[in-house]
Design a protein with these regions (language model features):
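Hydrophobic transmembrane alpha-helices of multi-pass small-molecule transport proteins
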Residues: 129-146, 162
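Transmembrane alpha-helices of multi-pass small-molecule transport proteins
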Residues: 37-86, 165-168, 188-205
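Loop-to-transmembrane-helix transition segments
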Residues: 12-20, 65-90, 154-162, 210-230
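C-terminal transmembrane-helix exit sites in multi-pass transporters
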Residues: 91-93, 110-132, 256-266
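Transmembrane alpha-helical segments that form core, pore/gating elements
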Residues: 29-32, 40-41, 55, 151-213, ...
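Hydrophobic/small/kink-forming positions within alpha-helical transmembrane segments
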Residues: 21-29, 56, 81-89, 111-116, ...
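Helix-helix packing/entry segments at the starts of transmembrane helices
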Residues: 103-109, 176-192, 232-263
Length: 266
């Protein structure tokens, strides 16, 4: 049944998505740089731990934020963060296996899954133009992976699975914006995913991973600490301002940006 919501305001959505685009592009570059020294679980530990520390510091400075951590939808938070952690791990893994532009291009099968889930779970409207955009996106993916030819890489399946997981995470995140604040969603995300990352580090038995870093590695570490937060803050606020079906396709703008950066860096 079509949603009765008014059309999404384009201005705020575009502004928040510009922040999302820049943050996640910098995140990808930082992860790729650190992957030469650190395992993926160690990188995810840095991201979640720094998120908890920064958000806790904000709560100390602004005590009113503490009330925003409470949520009546903890089960939905658990589902969202479990799926998101898996998606993030697969995404980070794909960054070590494939060129940056290829990773981002294949990641953008997510809008198709988001469109379907948003219609089924959120009651959003799937227009003809949006269907066309989804179809064109899938055609682009087929051009990139070229299934059935020699150039096909099994590693492309890693990012395709990550895209499916991200789509579930995106729709549940949109659902959470209907009841929870941006601060609360971010704090719970980092607090839930930190033990998951630490468990991975524990099984590897290497808690001294920061000692392997030299002076040149700390810039991407700082990048992960901050853009890991700003990316999700901007994306959450974009979902608060507009429909998921409208917001997610704007992320396609990351492809030319990361292709340009990847060409000069790698």
């Amino acid at each position: 049944m079509p949603s009765s919501r008014t059309p999404s305001p384009i201005g705020p959505v575009l502004l928040w998505m510009c922040g999302t685009l820049l943050s996640f592009s910098l995140m990808a570059i930082s992860v790729r740089q650190l992957s030469f020294k650190l395992a993926l679980m160690e990188i995810l530990t840095i991201r979640s731990f720094s998120g908890v520390v920064i958000l806790s510091a904000l709560a100390v400075l602004r005590p009113a934020l503490r009330r925003q951590i409470r949520s009546q939808r903890l089960a939905l938070h658990a589902v969202r963060n479990g799926v998101h952690f898996l998606a993030t791990y697969l995404w980070a893994l794909s960054l070590t296996l494939l060129p940056l532009a290829t990773v981002f291009a294949l990641e953008f099968t997510a809008p198709a899954w988001v469109s379907l889930l948003a219609v089924l779970l959120l009651g959003e409207r799937l227009s003809v133009s949006r269907i066309g955009a989804v179809v064109l996106g899938f055609i682009g993916v087929l051009v990139i992976i070229r299934p059935g030819v020699e150039t096909f890489q099994i590693s492309t399946l890693v990012i395709l699975l990550a895209a499916v997981c991200f789509s579930v995470s995106i729709v549940t995140q949109k659902m959470l914006t209907q009841s929870d604040t941006t601060y609360g969603i971010l704090f719970i995300m980092n607090a839930v995913q930190l033990p998951m990352a630490l468990a991975g580090v524990y099984f590897m038995g290497e808690f001294d991973f920061l000692l392997r870093l030299d002076a040149t590695d700390w810039l991407p570490v700082v990048g992960i600490c901050f853009v890991g937060l700003t990316g999700h803050m901007c994306l959450t606020n974009a979902f608060r301002a507009g429909d998921a079906i409208f917001v997610v396709p704007l992320d396609f703008l990351r492809i030319p940006l990361i292709a340009f950066v990847g060409y000069f860096l790698y």
